Amino acid sequence: MERAEKREFVTELNEVFKASGSVVVAHYAGATVAQMNDFRSKMRAAGGTVKVAKNRLAKIALQGTEAEGITDLFKGQTLIAYSTDPITAPKVVMDFAKTNDKIVVLGGAMGTTTLNADAVKSLATLPSLDELRAKLLGMIQTPATRIAGVVAAPASQLARVFAAYAKKDEAA
């Protein structure tokens, strides 16, 4: 890579770090090309991205971003997984790491918060933003459904009482 290319790559990576909701750093030593391609496609399908960058360039790109605290994680063969949704990148990385022992999570960042491997793991267990919205909408709709049922119940019970009186009068 020439100097101009490196500058452009660092600028690009800096913008990525600034725009990301979360960043996960992991070792990938020993992973095959097929495994990495599979990992990249799963991350892309979930709305995230995986990049492999030189550690020195990644450290330079981190300067001036909220995720600057993770510079110490860049040692050895590291990859960067990121997404705009704070939950997507950790979730996909942890799911892939369960089935592939070559991917070892080192840590990450979510905004200004630096995360260790355990924090990334616990972040991965949280529901995504869309799932939270669906749950909230369900919680909001449930009381309305119950109120409609309570309001409709007396009318239907009243109709049953009238029907019973009508049958009683017919029988008499």
Swiss-Prot record:
Gene3D superfamilies tied to this protein: 3.30.70.1730, 6.10.250.290
HAMAP family: Ribosomal_uL10 (MF_00362)
Reported function: Forms part of the ribosomal stalk, playing a central role in the interaction of the ribosome with GTP-bound translation factors.
MF term (GO), any: large ribosomal subunit rRNA binding
Subunit structure: Part of the ribosomal stalk of the 50S ribosomal subunit. The N-terminus interacts with L11 and the large rRNA to form the base of the stalk. The C-terminus forms an elongated spine to which L12 dimers bind in a sequential fashion forming a multimeric L10(L12)X complex.
PANTHER family in UniProt: 39S RIBOSOMAL PROTEIN L10, MITOCHONDRIAL
GO CC, alphabetical: ribonucleoprotein complex; ribosome
InterPro entries per UniProt: Ribosomal_uL10, Ribosomal_uL10-like_sf, Ribosomal_uL10_bac, Ribosomal_uL10_bac_type
Organism: Rhizobium leguminosarum bv. trifolii (strain WSM2304)
SUPFAM superfamilies (UniProt xref): Ribosomal protein L10-like
UniProt similarity note: Belongs to the universal ribosomal protein uL10 family.
One Pfam family matching this protein: Ribosomal_L10
Gene of this entry: rplJ
GO terms (BP aspect): translation
Keywords, sorted A to Z: Ribonucleoprotein, Ribosomal protein, RNA-binding, rRNA-binding
Protein name in the entry: Large ribosomal subunit protein uL10
